Amino acid sequence: MEEQTTSLVWIYVNSTEQLNTSYEYNTTYLIEDSDKYQSYVIGLFLSCLYTILLFPIGFIGNILILVVNLNHRGKMAIPDLYFVNLAVADLILVADSLIEVFNLNEKYYDYAVLCTFMSLFLQVNMYSSIFFLTWMSFDRYIALANSMSSSPLRTMQHAKLSCGLIWMASILATLLPFTIVQTQHRGEVHFCFANVFEIQWLEVTIGFLVPFSIIGLCYSLIGRILMRSQKHRGLWPRRQKALRMIVVVVLVFFICWLPENVFISIQLLQGTADPSQRTATTLRHDYPLTGHIVNLAAFSNSCLNPIIYSFLGETFRDKLRLFIKQKASWSVVNRFCHHGLDLHLPVRSEVSEV
């Protein structure tokens, strides 16, 4: 009798433990599922805001910068040429962002070809943007340092050559590591270029830390020159306006790309401490909403540049007004010509001559 009672008690205790364990598991699962759903909804809302508010500005604005400047090719100054190339890089990223911003569940990273292709596009744009901004800061320093004399470095021919070299450097900075990594991971079906630990270090170093060190040095030298030139204030108004626009563009770039690089750096430091976590998607899978927000911040930079360029660039505003007037006058002329033709041309008779 005692043995039966003991066995019944044991069965009851065991069943209770199993029920408690099952309840705790189900509760944990429901909480995690609820958190994922909440993150998904917030991410979807932010993606919709980006698509409605920022994407049209970035896409149409960068195209407008290209069309207006190319329409006034003869009046294009050296800073305008750099901004045109920056607009091309931004347009590539804005077009790519429409796919990336709705990658809420990171499903695109499961397809190696799509993951690699999008990563290559993103890196080429990122490198070209930061390289152009770095070179523009250096160009502004050269312009101010040699304000009293013409510098052989600041000619349109050298500017075009510089743009070509910057694009080549951006492509090489992306394709050379890609080629090396591809040979190391040959035969791996599910290998993605974006998941390589060393590539992430290269992106943070070459694409952020080194360029901003150079930019900081250039602007500290520019500040020193401007402080010394107070007695020649009449010579600086136009230069200060151009300088102000470039400073704002660089600051916006820094603010937009800093969260992305901090996020990647935390991930890299985790991988350094624990080699088993050396994958680019670990932190993004653990904190998908944070990863999505820093992505949106980075993409927003390419949408904000046209606004900065149109509001702070007086030369561009003048070109835009002239461009609109030309288009409006051409439309008036076309309507006048069509109206004149309708009045003076005889109406064709429907009766055929015999």
Swiss-Prot record:
CC terms in the record's Gene Ontology section = axon; basolateral plasma membrane; cytoplasmic vesicle membrane; cytoskeleton; dendritic spine membrane; early endosome; endoplasmic reticulum membrane; Golgi membrane
GO terms, molecular function: G protein-coupled receptor activity; nuclear estrogen receptor activity; steroid binding; steroid hormone binding
**What does the entry state regarding organ or tissue expression?**
Expressed in oocytes (at protein level). Highly expressed in brain, heart, testis and ovary. Weakly expressed in muscle and intestine.
The cellular location(s) given in this protein's UniProt record come to: Nucleus; Cytoplasm, Perinuclear region; Cytoplasm; Cytoplasm, Cytoskeleton
- Extracellular-side stretches of the chain, per the record, are 1-40, 103-112, 182-202, 267-292
Bridged cysteine pairs (disulfide): C115-C192
Q: How does it sit in the membrane?
A: Multi-pass membrane protein
Q: Is Disulfide bond one of the keywords UniProt gives this record?
A: yes
What InterPro entries does the entry give?
GPCR_Rhodpsn (IPR000276), GPCR_Rhodpsn_7TM (IPR017452), GPER1-like (IPR047143)
Sorted alphabetically, the Gene Ontology BP terms of this entry are:
adenylate cyclase-activating G protein-coupled receptor signaling pathway; apoptotic process; cell differentiation; cellular response to estradiol stimulus; cellular response to gonadotropin stimulus; negative regulation of meiotic cell cycle; negative regulation of oocyte maturation; nervous system development
UniProt keyword annotation of Disulfide bond present: yes
Topological domain ranges for the Cytoplasmic compartment = 62-81, 134-160, 224-245, 314-353
Provide the transmembrane region boundaries.
Answer: 41-61, 82-102, 113-133, 161-181, 203-223, 246-266, 293-313
Subcellular location, principal:
nucleus
**What keywords is this UniProt entry annotated with?**
Apoptosis, Cell cycle, Cell membrane, Cell projection, Cytoplasm, Cytoplasmic vesicle, Cytoskeleton, Developmental protein, Differentiation, Disulfide bond, Endoplasmic reticulum, Endosome, G-protein coupled receptor, Golgi apparatus, Membrane, Mitochondrion, Neurogenesis, Nucleus, Postsynaptic cell membrane, Receptor, Synapse, Transducer, Transmembrane, Transmembrane helix
- Matches recorded under Pfam families: 7tm_1
Summarizing the function annotation, the protein's role is: Membrane G-protein coupled estrogen receptor that binds to 17-beta-estradiol (E2) with high affinity, leading to rapid and transient activation of numerous intracellular signaling pathways. Plays a role in the embryonic development of sensory and motor neurons. May induce apoptosis and reduce proliferation of brain cells. Involved in maintenance of meiotic arrest in oocytes.
Stated family:
Belongs to the G-protein coupled receptor 1 family.
Subunit description: Homodimer. Heterodimer.
What's the protein here called?
A: G-protein coupled estrogen receptor 1
Gene name of this polypeptide: gper1
